[in-house]
Amino acid sequence: MSKKNSQTSPQRQKMHVKKGDVVQVIAGSDKGKVGEILRALPQESTVVVKGVNIRTKHTKPQQEGESGQIVTYEAPIHSSKVMLYSEKKKIASRVGYTLTEDGRKVRILKKTGEIID
């Protein structure tokens, strides 16, 4: 019998958020911060949120005469640590799915009933 390698690429998970959504961080050192999703990475189930999980990177000079730099960037966080956020009502909510009158499936905020997309 052949044994499956557990290190193969993980299955893509369905994520409750996507690029452009406004979310609130619900766990970790950045708990309570609100920001927009810049990038969604479904293979790792992570998202990059603007202004959240800021990391600093010290880069060496690459060419003669160039000086080194300290670069700050947003690192990814797990998608389970964010919740969709209503900017109108200033409240975080779980996501729900419903059909509109014309038959489109849309995402809604469960607490407010607000349609997201």
Curated annotation (Swiss-Prot):
Summary of subunit composition and partner proteins: Part of the 50S ribosomal subunit.
State one molecular function term (GO).
structural constituent of ribosome
Name of the molecule in the record: Large ribosomal subunit protein uL24
List the Gene3D superfamilies. Answer: 2.30.30.30
Q: What does this protein do?
A: One of two assembly initiator proteins, it binds directly to the 5'-end of the 23S rRNA, where it nucleates assembly of the 50S subunit.
Which GO terms of type biological process are on file? translation
Keyword flag DNA-binding: no
Q: Which family does it belong to?
A: Belongs to the universal ribosomal protein uL24 family.
Q: Where is the composition biased (Polar residues)?
A: 1-12
